[in-house]
Amino acid sequence: MNESGERPVIEYSALAQALRKFAAERDWEQFHSPKNLVMALTGEAGELAEVFQWMTEEDSKAAARNPSTAQAVRDELADVLLYVVRAADVLGVDLNAAVTEKLRVNAEKYPVDASRGNSRKYTDL
């Protein structure tokens, strides 16, 4: 529960702490600048995209269950998450607050009655 008594949208503090410990044990804090972490995050997102590159829509929907791609999907999703959490921790960003606020903003940009069933950008609704 947070200060207002609500459950967090996401709970990541244990992961942030584990990543902090992992970096400290290896003396990697010196390399974990925001710039380096974001660059690494971009690389990992690219590796995730590479798993899906040239797949059909149908194949992409089954990628996490397909024995030939499932492990890569899991690994790259995990890498992306690890870098997001580590970057947020280094930058002092409360991901729960950021995600909660972003969900609120997106709900305003994309009201259900105007956006249900279409993929138009909020500026075109």
Regions found by a protein language model. Give the residues of each.
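Flexible "arm" and connector segments at domain edges
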Residues: 1-125
